[in-house]
Amino acid sequence: MNLQKQQGALVISLDFESHWGVHDRIPLGKYRQNLLGERHVISRLLELFREYNIHTTWATVGFLFAETRDELLSALPTKRPMYANRRLSTYDEIKDIGNDEQEDPLHFAASIIRLIAAAPHQEIGTHTFSHFYCLEKGQDSEMFRADLEAAAAIADKYKISLESLVFPRNQENISYLSICRELGIKAYRGNEHSWVYKAKSREDETLLRRGIRLLDAYLPISGHNCYSAKVLGCSLPLNIPSSRFLRPFSRKLKIFEPLRLRRIRSDLRYAAKNRLIYHLWWHPHNFGKNTNENLTVLKDILEYFSLMRDKYGMESLNMRELSQKHIDRCGLNAH
């Protein structure tokens, strides 16, 4: 496998989940502004990505593909997760949603999905069908298989083939990777290699780890988290680990914003100079509040990436593009 000509690469993946992704964590009343703002944010993100020629993967919850409540109900798999903690189940939320996107824009997004699919260099991947938690008690591999099959079926209506996966809450479960491969997933976003980012169930997560991750956004605690293409290996699905979560702007932490930006610039420069991969991710709803401040930060990052592209030949690749380039180098049969 010849990796000598590999340039540095910026990979961006976005977890597009709307209310399905936060229903068990944040009361709707407290987060409604973020979720309603998400739709406007996505249009502005697409404009920025077009302006800077940024290739992005949008890992989208399958429920959002349904145009109506009836369509969603008809698309549900028969095997569903029976989480020990019932609060985690998105299925229990369906009874309370509206009939369609116009009535309930927090649970339907067909028009947004079409907007993304029509934009240049944007990949629509999967965030599972139901925002499926792969490390929680009460689910198993057959339930996961049924979930991914349902995601593929509803995406097929849009003529979208799902090839990239992001595990909800980053609950990476390596025992499910063979199922991903069987169902056509060629790449997934794994976690950073530091112990503070190791995949955990909600029950096993600790305040200490959360606190260190917060500090890591501002100070170089876990390092650059960039990596060589060799790390991807040569077996499907490829693990394209995250490097950094782009935390949303916080007025309480505003004084530290220069540190956060410097951290990401330093990562980008290191990746560009050393021909490494840098994988940045966030949720569109993170930008639904303080939208202008968040987009100003992102624009600064993309401006700096443009400098790295001009100076070192750094590329912008979505997960599908990176995995396909790597598959070609490895000589893998991806079918």
Residue ranges and their predicted role:
Residues I240-L246:
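Positively charged, amphipathic and often flexible ligand-engagement surfaces
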Residues M1-S164, R169-I240, F256-L280, F287-H335:
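Catalytic alpha-helical scaffold of carbohydrate-active enzymes acting on polysaccharides/glycoconjugates
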